[in-house]
Amino acid sequence: MSFYQPSLSLYDVLNALSNQTGQRGQQGYPRQPQRPQRYHPHYGQVHVGGHHPRHHPLYSRYNGVPNTYYYQFPGQAYYYSPEYGYDDEDGEEEDQDEDMVGDSGTTRQEDGGEDSNSRRYPSYYHCNTARNNRTNQQANSLNDLLTALIGVPPYEGTEPEIEANTEQEGEKGEEKDKKDKSEAPKEEAGETNKEKPLNQLEESSRPPLAKKSSSFAHLQAPSPIPDPLQVSKPETRMDLPFSPEVNVYDTEDTYVVVLALPGANSRAFHIDYHPSSHEMLIKGKIEDRVGIDEKFLKITELKYGAFERTVKFPVLPRIKDEEIKATYNNGLLQIKVPKIVNDTEKPKPKKRIAIEEIPDEELEFEENPNPTVEN
């Protein structure tokens, strides 16, 4: 059996290419990214600010939980992973794209106004880049608010208005003075005269800055240098003991460690102090005493089961490990660790160790190969 294979000429190839280009032209150009307050043809309505449909990539960014449901965490310098126990395989959050942060700041400000300016998005304790992106987003939203109060439309700077005013002032100056002057000095003079009232309006319309209340007074920026007083990093894995919330107080004569353990029993706690590593390990187990079957459970935020947390103290001042005391009351486990403030103990004197001389059997045999044995 033979098959016939037709031969293609150059004309046939060119004709096929022209047909493909014609079909692409009928489909139209690819859709360009739309700016806020623009009509999206594939949505059928105008989307302003943060109102995006569920399949939009920015939907989850504006429909999350407000930051009022979150509390602040210490910086990275206060967390460490203890060497003993289990390994910490806590994954870090991925860095967000800077372009997405910039777009979200502008769209959120145009929609919410003052409400969106007061709302802040949560930033997680193990993600420094998210904290930096949040500050950039707040700065962009503040600029958009100022432009909205002044009356300048979005996505348009103040340069076109300044240039138009400078041209009018230049024409008036030419008619009055009737002198040949270059346009550059007039534009510079007009810009300086116009920027002053704009700056005054921005300063007058700028809202007062609110002070951020924080339970960590000296935490202003993350420091790469570890703090001498540290706690173990909170565990997020479900197959390992959970980490209860902890507060550590450093007073003049004692360290006070407070852990939140509601619904627990003091007999289920185990507190161990390791003098060699200056670490205190608190572990135990919390039992579910509600008495309702888990099949009726719909929302769960309470933690039950095994827990574990470690506190690492500085080397100095030293700690009186024999006087450590712990109390459990109202769901709070309070541990007081006293310090040795005035160390009056004298250092022990140096002790020289004498080396004992042991005779060498081989040398003795060489000196006396035939020893005489006495009867």
Swiss-Prot record:
<dbReference type="GO" id="GO:0005737">
    <property type="term" value="C:cytoplasm"/>
</dbReference>
<dbReference type="GO" id="GO:0009651">
    <property type="term" value="P:response to salt stress"/>
</dbReference>
<dbReference type="GO" id="GO:0009408">
    <property type="term" value="P:response to heat"/>
</dbReference>
<feature type="modified residue" description="Phosphoserine">
    <location>
        <position position="215"/>
    </location>
</feature>
<dbReference type="InterPro" id="IPR002068">
    <property type="entry name" value="A-crystallin/Hsp20_dom"/>
</dbReference>
<feature type="compositionally biased region" description="Acidic residues">
    <location>
        <begin position="357"/>
        <end position="367"/>
    </location>
</feature>
<feature type="compositionally biased region" description="Low complexity">
    <location>
        <begin position="22"/>
        <end position="48"/>
    </location>
</feature>
<comment type="subunit">
    <text>Forms oligomeric complexes. Interacts with itself.</text>
</comment>
<feature type="region of interest" description="Disordered">
    <location>
        <begin position="347"/>
        <end position="375"/>
    </location>
</feature>
<feature type="modified residue" description="Phosphoserine">
    <location>
        <position position="214"/>
    </location>
</feature>
<feature type="compositionally biased region" description="Basic residues">
    <location>
        <begin position="49"/>
        <end position="58"/>
    </location>
</feature>
<dbReference type="GO" id="GO:0140311">
    <property type="term" value="F:protein sequestering activity"/>
</dbReference>
<keyword id="KW-0346">Stress response</keyword>
<dbReference type="InterPro" id="IPR008978">
    <property type="entry name" value="HSP20-like_chaperone"/>
</dbReference>
<feature type="compositionally biased region" description="Basic and acidic residues">
    <location>
        <begin position="169"/>
        <end position="197"/>
    </location>
</feature>
<feature type="compositionally biased region" description="Acidic residues">
    <location>
        <begin position="158"/>
        <end position="168"/>
    </location>
</feature>
<protein>
    <recommendedName>
        <fullName>Heat shock protein 42</fullName>
    </recommendedName>
</protein>
<dbReference type="GO" id="GO:0042542">
    <property type="term" value="P:response to hydrogen peroxide"/>
</dbReference>
<dbReference type="GO" id="GO:0051259">
    <property type="term" value="P:protein complex oligomerization"/>
</dbReference>
<feature type="region of interest" description="Disordered">
    <location>
        <begin position="154"/>
        <end position="238"/>
    </location>
</feature>
<feature type="compositionally biased region" description="Acidic residues">
    <location>
        <begin position="85"/>
        <end position="101"/>
    </location>
</feature>
<feature type="region of interest" description="Disordered">
    <location>
        <begin position="21"/>
        <end position="59"/>
    </location>
</feature>
<keyword id="KW-0597">Phosphoprotein</keyword>
<feature type="modified residue" description="Phosphoserine">
    <location>
        <position position="223"/>
    </location>
</feature>
<feature type="domain" description="sHSP">
    <location>
        <begin position="237"/>
        <end position="356"/>
    </location>
</feature>
<feature type="modified residue" description="Phosphoserine">
    <location>
        <position position="213"/>
    </location>
</feature>
<dbReference type="Pfam" id="PF00011">
    <property type="entry name" value="HSP20"/>
</dbReference>
<dbReference type="GO" id="GO:0006457">
    <property type="term" value="P:protein folding"/>
</dbReference>
<comment type="similarity">
    <text>Belongs to the small heat shock protein (HSP20) family.</text>
</comment>
<dbReference type="GO" id="GO:0007010">
    <property type="term" value="P:cytoskeleton organization"/>
</dbReference>
<feature type="region of interest" description="Disordered">
    <location>
        <begin position="81"/>
        <end position="127"/>
    </location>
</feature>
<dbReference type="GO" id="GO:0051082">
    <property type="term" value="F:unfolded protein binding"/>
</dbReference>
<feature type="modified residue" description="Phosphoserine">
    <location>
        <position position="182"/>
    </location>
</feature>
